Amino acid sequence: FHRKYYHPSNSYIYLYGDMDVVERLEWMDKEYLSKYDYLEVDSEIKKQKPFDKPCFVKKEYAISDSEKEEESAVLISNFVIGDSLDIELNIAFQILEYAIMQMPGAPLKQALIEANIGKDVTGSYEDDILQPVYSITAKYANEADADKLNQMIDRTLENIVRTGIHKDALRAGLNSLEFKT
């Protein structure tokens, strides 16, 4: 793996500053690049095939003696959100996510809190990979509430689709995004 992907053939070399570019390239070739044979490297990042059905993973982790086992689970639901190269979708999702999960009184977060699924409910959007992932996490939860978490997410999102999102919430999401960038 390392010899194939961490090879000069699979790299970009950037030069910066005031210099004689031809002289610098000749030096790089003599001192570095000429010591390697060219490799044809297919380093395209392939999209992961969607799961045919939901996938459940259970992992054990240590808790302190003062923690109750029935209130120490971390429940996470993950969703692939398009493609990171779709800038419009990426921006729209960040605005939407703020409106339904981050802002005070956000409907999805509020529904999960009111359903008593965990003591700390958060959403996070990882958009620095080819297929961005949105995660909804309930910490200090009961493991038995895993199905309840997914049902509440589905039910609440269906309700949001039916009833819509207030324009002020979307404006707040846009303002939040503008503030971050």
Can you say where each PLM-predicted feature lies in the sequence?
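Charge-rich, well-structured scaffold segments of protease-associated domains
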Residues: 1-51, 65-93, 98-181
